Amino acid sequence: MELTLKTAKRVEIIDITDQVERCVESRDGLVLVYTPHTTTALVINEGERGLLEDILEFMEKLVPYGKGYKHDRLDSNADAHLKATLLGNSVVVPVESGKLALGTWQRILFLEFDGPRTRRVIVKAL
């Protein structure tokens, strides 16, 4: 299955947990969630608004935009590639009786670092 996301900002976090869970109804096993873009990432963490803002602020401090990275000579988005590299492009979650076996506060979060764009997320039940 594939999800299509339309991001609205250059940098944002979108909770895709419910969409992924709909993809695995009546399944058991594992689900692989993968983003095929080099300027996006996937993580599992709490979806509380303050934490999401903290994550974005932390990533910006860690890898600031427009700091003269070599790749910026081509596309002005080197920071987005570096941020995505640090976080990774996939997560794997156990599925039990059609439900994601996530912890109480855990959510699957899609991170956009070079939007706004239309993005794909591949969801593969294993």
UniProtKB/Swiss-Prot annotation:
Source organism (scientific name): Archaeoglobus fulgidus (strain ATCC 49558 / DSM 4304 / JCM 9628 / NBRC 100126 / VC-16)
SUPFAM superfamilies tied to this protein: YjbQ-like
Family: Belongs to the UPF0047 family.
UniProt-listed Gene3D superfamilies: YjbQ-like (2.60.120.460)
InterPro entries: UPF0047_YjbQ-like, YjbQ-like_sf
Alphabetical list of PROSITE patterns matching this protein: UPF0047
A Pfam family that the UniProt record links to this protein: UPF0047
UniProt protein name: UPF0047 protein AF_2050
Domain of life assignment: Archaea
